[in-house]
Amino acid sequence: PVLPGIKVMPGLPVLSFMHWILAILIIAVIHEFSHGIYARLYKVKVKSSGFALFGPILAAFVEPDEKQISKKSKKVQLAVFSAGPFSNILTGFLFIAVMTFITLPLQAAVFVPDGITVNGLLDDYPMQSTNAEIPFIINQFNDHEIKDFNDFSNATLDLKPGDNAIVGTNKGEFSIVAAQNPENSSKGFIGVSNFALNRAPNEEIVSKYGSFVPPAVDWIHMLFFWLWVVSWGVG
């Protein structure tokens, strides 16, 4: 079930209450009124339509005349009943397009890379022995500043087994001795996994437009993300 505050599945963010309410409302309106439009198209009377309130949830409904629709051909019945799910699938593609061409580019403009978030440590490897508490953000590796994945890859490119290294994080510095890479014995390995790019608000954008802009862009992007997920789930 797609419910606020619950981890739906690994890899998906937690759904906020406001995103849930808005996503359900928008998708319900698209779904139900598509039934109504197709009913009118095939001259089936719509007995009632409107909005309903289920606790905090605002929903939409359309009620075609069952007697009239039962007299129509199977093709017409199928068209009317499938209009809602089909519309949800189509608008799902629209939401993907909005994310691809609008909200993701906006996120790239209002945020800047600011280190690598580590969410996992591998057993019996150097970083685990430091007792570093995950998650943590790597922002320095020896003399290299780490802003993104390329920085981290370049900083560890020449690391050999047995090399000493200083890993700078938001939770302090850790001194380690590189282990042997399990996939390439000539390469050093520190034993971190499950990376994510950490982001910080773009100070130029913040100073020009205000500190509310980056979180607002994130919020809007997540709305379209959940509209897409729920649309295809319903469709």
Where in this protein do the model-derived segments appear?
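Hydrophobic transmembrane alpha-helices and their immediate loop junctions
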Residues: 1-235
